[in-house]
Amino acid sequence: MPTAQINGHTMYYEIHGQGDPAICMGGWGTFCHGGERNLARGLTDRYSVLLIDYRGIGESDDDLSVAPSMTLFADDVIGLLDHLGWTNVHFIGLVGMGACISQRVAIARPDLVRSMVNMGAWARCDDFLRDQLEMFGTVHRDSGFEAFQKFVTVMSFLPEYYNENKNKLLGPNGGWKELNGHYEAHARFIEACINHDVWDELQHVQCPTLVIHAGQDLVTSPRTTEPLERLIPGAEGVTMEDVAHVVAGKDQKIRFCNILLPWLEQH
């Protein structure tokens, strides 16, 4: 499987599909190693989609002497795109960290970003979001991965979906499994997320941008995503009123695809 020496670490990546270049990044996990099945249906039919393991999880290593920041993770992506010779890439950033990385790349290297989609994102942390993110880390550190997994899962899915799918959401093959046994990587993700602040820089984003607001999100609610729509020049916004932090279930996934794919085609 492909790896490259990027920005002082070994970076694992996969490319799925054929077509114009796109990159899809999520939160504290990866779409690699079979996770591509969670991509928007039809995305890899139309695009060459780059997926990565963030430093410290999966098959990517990390240099713990380097302080974590969203700029560091963005520089990893920039280095990999330069390594691949990719420019003019559709950036799809979902469920937190991937969206924030996309913002940083769009600001630093506009030549790389053809368009940007943000969902579950923020321009900077308020006290509420900061304390939530810190609590996720505290639970993982003090009570273990299983307690963290249950905590973050009940915060990320609608009650009805959780009740019907609890057995597949939890456990060794459940959500956030990449963090199991990797508390230090998780802590570094949290530090980067908490310190992310592009409030005064988003005015420099040049690419077409779509911000998707999740009306039932308990972590990155419209409180944190609506400022992105206001601060990014020309940004468009769409609200999915009944969606929590994670798009889940057949109906939600179809509606998400029906928002995402036509918008990408227009840009």
Report each predicted region and the residues it spans.
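Flexible "cap/lid" loop of the alpha/beta hydrolase fold
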Residues: 103-107, 113-143
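Active-site loop/oxyanion-hole signature of alpha/beta-hydrolase fold enzymes
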Residues: 50-90
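Conserved HGGG/HGGXW glycine-rich cap/lid loop of the alpha/beta-hydrolase fold
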Residues: 5-62
